[in-house]
């Protein structure tokens, strides 16, 4: 599946997108796999309350299943005015 990183998440990880082979069942499982890869992922995903996730371009949560998902995007909460 494709994993996309936006804003400061992209800055901390150092890439905007990657294709990931995973056995993760939920988004949280995927995050744990990524954090175990390298320190830069652990830093980016240290505080999940500061992150939002979208699955196939629909806002979701970290307990959501990944079955059938083709794209996961991580980004900080948006503010508007």
Spans of features found by a protein language model:
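Ubiquitin-like/PB1-type beta-grasp interaction modules and other compact soluble beta-rich domains
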Residues: 1-80
């Amino acid at each position: 599946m494709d994993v996309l990183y936006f804003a400061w998440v992209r800055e901390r990880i150092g890439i905007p997108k990657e294709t990931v082979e995973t056995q993760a069942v939920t988004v949280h499982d995927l995050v744990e796999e990524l954090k175990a890869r390298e320190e830069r992922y652990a830093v980016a995903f240290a505080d999940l309350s500061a992150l939002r996730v979208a699955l196939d371009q629909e806002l979701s949560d970290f307990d959501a299943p990944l079955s059938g998902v083709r794209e996961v995007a991580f980004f900080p909460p948006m503010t508007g005015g």
